[in-house]
């Protein structure tokens, strides 16, 4: 008799995706982040659902409803801080996942990579709208500044901004629609994750060597389920430590002040995970140029498969490319730091240099170094 997990129409899909899935035997801990992202998404949907039961998306009561959740709802503070810090964990895993893809050449699975880039955009949009919901000072002014960037689009810009606002400023209509989209998008993201996995399972996973591993595959369960559970415990430990001991460490103190359209905070800045893109935006003195640089800084990931010049897939055996990759990481950390600093000397010039370096590494240096390594290896 056939095992039910292999014959049942629904269980068969689960079996082929998570149990009997042939997986390269050599994949390292860098391959843990996919499953961690899935768990982060599930955690965000669950905590978000319970928060939505107590939250009101009205400018008069939004701030009070968040305070009510923290003070009066049973374990409401746990839900709120799990959700807020869970977003930070989500982005840490997301950036490490993308970094892994860049380092090991996973972007050559073009369909999986492109769906992944769209997923990144969707998660960023969701996080931005979620940051507006508590209706604190930074929520209000962050929403005003970022949505206002669309006014840089020629001809239709101003109309587009007012259409998104639903008013002539960020107001009740804006908050209500942001709440609606913030609730809806994670479910769309979940569907896109399925597509992401569908494309991945068409080709199978990449591995650290970048060499096809068809001859050496092992079942996903129990080997990688156990390995993923270790990663899960480490992430949950970090998240709970953050929630229980330093819940506001990654937040902005200004967001504990109710939104006031008449008082601008001294330094308007987004959450830490958007600071690198914000620094690129600010480094260009022209509004339209800044907006284009901001969008291209993420959209550039789409063209990375086209910029791959090396005859090796992974960077494992390419030391010069490795140096360039870690320079890119250092550059992104520098941009993150600059994004949180005021617009004054020397931060402005550091931000501009880091922005130029960011685009130069990806568009110019990485393809050139790939060709150079081919030449050095006489390929």
From Swiss-Prot:
GO terms for cellular component: mitochondrial inner membrane; respiratory chain complex III
Predominant localisation class: mitochondrion
Binding positions for a ubiquinone per the UniProt entry: 201
Cofactors that this protein relies on: heme b
UniProt-listed Pfam families: Cytochrom_B_C (PF00032), Cytochrome_B (PF00033)
Binding sites annotated in the UniProt record for heme b b566: 97, 196
Cofactor comment text: Binds 2 heme b groups non-covalently.
Transmembrane segments: 33-53, 77-98, 113-133, 178-198, 226-246, 288-308, 320-340, 347-367
Keyword entries, A-Z: Electron transport, Heme, Iron, Membrane, Metal-binding, Mitochondrion, Mitochondrion inner membrane, Respiratory chain, Transmembrane, Transmembrane helix, Transport, Ubiquinone
Topology of the protein relative to the lipid bilayer: Multi-pass membrane protein
Compartment(s): Mitochondrion inner membrane
PROSITE patterns linked: CYTB_CTER (PS51003), CYTB_NTER (PS51002)
Molecular function (Gene Ontology), one example: ubiquinol-cytochrome-c reductase activity
GO BP of this protein: mitochondrial electron transport, ubiquinol to cytochrome c
Database matches in SUPFAM superfamilies: a domain/subunit of cytochrome bc1 complex (Ubiquinol-cytochrome c reductase), Transmembrane di-heme cytochromes
Binding site for heme b b562: 83, 182
Misc. remarks from the entry: Heme 1 (or BL or b562) is low-potential and absorbs at about 562 nm, and heme 2 (or BH or b566) is high-potential and absorbs at about 566 nm.
UniProt family annotation: Belongs to the cytochrome b family.
Protein name: Cytochrome b
Organism for this UniProt entry: Cnephaeus nilssonii (Northern bat)
Lineage: Eukaryota, Metazoa, Chordata, Craniata, Vertebrata
């Amino acid at each position: 008799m056939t095992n039910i997990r292999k014959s049942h129409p629904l269980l068969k899909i689960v079996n082929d995706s998570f149990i009997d899935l042939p997986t390269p035997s050599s994949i390292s801990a860098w391959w843990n982040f996919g499953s961690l992202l899935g768990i982060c998404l599930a955690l965000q949907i669950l905590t978000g659902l319970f928060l939505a039961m107590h939250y009101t998306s009205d400018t008069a009561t939004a701030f009070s409803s968040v305070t009510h959740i923290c003070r009066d709802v049973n374990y409401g503070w746990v839900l709120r801080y799990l959700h807020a810090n869970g977003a930070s964990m989500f982005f840490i895993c997301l950036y490490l996942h993308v970094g892994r893809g860049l380092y090991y050449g996973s972007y050559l699975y073009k369909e999986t990579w492109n769906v992944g880039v769209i997923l990144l955009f969707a998660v960023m949009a969701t996080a931005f709208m979620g940051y507006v919901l508590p209706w604190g000072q930074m929520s209000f002014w962050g929403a005003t500044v970022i949505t206002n960037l669309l006014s840089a689009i020629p001809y239709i810009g101003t109309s587009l901004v007012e259409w998104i606002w639903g008013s002539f400023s960020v107001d009740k209509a804006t908050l209500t629609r942001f709440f609606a989209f913030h609730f809806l998008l994670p479910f769309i993201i979940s569907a896109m994750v399925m597509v992401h996995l569908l494309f991945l399972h068409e080709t199978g996973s990449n591995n650290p060597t970048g060499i096809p591993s068809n001859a050496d595959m092992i079942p996903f369960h129990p080997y990688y389920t156990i390995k993923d559970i270790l990663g899960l415990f480490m992430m949950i430990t970090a998240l709970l430590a953050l929630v229980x001991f330093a819940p506001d460490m990654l937040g902005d103190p200004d967001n504990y002040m109710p939104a006031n359209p008449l008082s601008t905070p001294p330094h308007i800045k987004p959450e830490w995970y958007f600071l690198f893109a914000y620094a690129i935006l600010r480094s260009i003195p022209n509004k339209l140029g800044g907006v284009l640089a901001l969008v291209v800084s993420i959209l550039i990931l789409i063209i990375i498969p086209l910029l791959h010049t090396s005859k090796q897939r992974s960077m494992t055996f390419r030391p010069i490319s490795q140096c360039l990759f870690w320079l890119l990481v250092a550059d992104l950390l520098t941009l993150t730091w600059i994004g949180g600093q005021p617009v004054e000397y020397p931060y402005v010039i550091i931000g501009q240099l880091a922005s130029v370096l960011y685009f130069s590494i990806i568009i110019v240096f990485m393809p050139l170094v790939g060709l150079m390594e081919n030449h050095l290896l006489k390929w």
